[in-house]
């Protein structure tokens, strides 16, 4: 399952270990029991979520392959309860792929952590032109340094954080729900929100009961409760 994100990025599910009822099995092992009926298992998942017993959900593991701008990657790695391997800029050359926003945003006067899109055509045109020109110049400087024989690990320091990188990201469902609370929310940066929504879509498709319970009892953000968000 692969979802396109932004204009050149994606998030792809590589593999998943477990499903909704892996949490049920983990919870019931305390009593020497396993699965019962689908109805009772669903009730248990809802009970666990409602009462904050989230450790059984750590037994559901997702592995993703993600292509994303470096500045989004830097936010992703702040979620420490996950395993990450990123493409190396020391051993591989960066291709000419970078993120350009479709529209300019300005600081939100109400939500100080957020930003809002502007309808000013002149600002959009001039802002995007300046972003594109600056990135192109830095990438050409990077290529020139490589041509001069400068090591990749040093030449890359001129590159902007809009460059695309790739990583493998492995995370359990409990940590994923924490990620969604923080990133599938209007306080998060717009570009980060788009990746969080893609993660939520995959989570919902693979663990629909857990996802439903999460939204009902544990989700503290706002985007996932917006109709049509996925």
UniProtKB/Swiss-Prot annotation:
Listed cofactors: FAD
GO MF: flavin adenine dinucleotide binding; NADPH binding; thymidylate synthase (FAD) activity; thymidylate synthase activity
Binding site for dUMP: 75-78, 86-90, 156, 183
Source domain of life: Bacteria
A biological-process GO annotation: dTTP biosynthetic process
Keywords, in A-Z order: FAD, Flavoprotein, Methyltransferase, NADP, Nucleotide biosynthesis, Transferase
Active site, UniProt feature: 183 (involved in ionization of n3 of dump, leading to its activation)
SUPFAM superfamilies xrefs: Thymidylate synthase-complementing protein Thy1
Positions occupied by motif ThyX motif: 78-88
Sites where the protein binds FAD: 55, 78-80, 86, 172-174, 178
EC number(s) per entry: 2.1.1.148
Catalytic activity: dUMP + (6R)-5,10-methylene-5,6,7,8-tetrahydrofolate + NADPH + H(+) = dTMP + (6S)-5,6,7,8-tetrahydrofolate + NADP(+)
Domain ThyX span(s) in chain numbering: 1-217
Pathway given in the UniProt record: Pyrimidine metabolism; dTTP biosynthesis
Function: Catalyzes the reductive methylation of 2'-deoxyuridine-5'-monophosphate (dUMP) to 2'-deoxythymidine-5'-monophosphate (dTMP) while utilizing 5,10-methylenetetrahydrofolate (mTHF) as the methyl donor, and NADPH and FADH(2) as the reductant.
Subunit details: Homotetramer.
HAMAP family linked: ThyX (MF_01408)
Protein family: Belongs to the thymidylate synthase ThyX family.
Protein name per the record: Flavin-dependent thymidylate synthase
Gene that encodes the chain: thyX
